[in-house]
């Protein structure tokens, strides 16, 4: 059975789809026949408009990843059958607001895991980061963002161990291309966009 057949007609929740990776995920899901349901703090279709001609057709639900009640409401409304969790504040934002970023990155992740547990969702992936593993000879984490991501991986492992909630964590390294205009690895994309002008 192909992936497109498995996903056709199914609603997949994408948190953080206003970002670069999320926009590309929404585009791919549409092409596979799935129904992407974007959950983000603000409706910003700028990156979607950059890469897909039918960006307005994507369902967009406003909400804060730290609001579990709102997440549950969206999941019930759209009969969500899969989750791709990408919502997070990146390195510079974590450094600027340690408490707020921990609330979003860590509490947001536990809310997604709990949503999957309560709704019986068995198709879930989440973005970790190459920043998650310890670096150097002393096994230290270089950023608070990395600490958030390793925490997310550990919480996902416990949700599997204690409640059999399956998930797949992905550790992207350098992200570049259309739509990548924030974060530590945005410079190549920003330079390419500037060169096109």
PLM features: residue spans?
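Structural signature of the Rossmann-like NAD(P)-dependent dehydrogenase/reductase core
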Residues: 14-15, 85, 123-126, 168-174
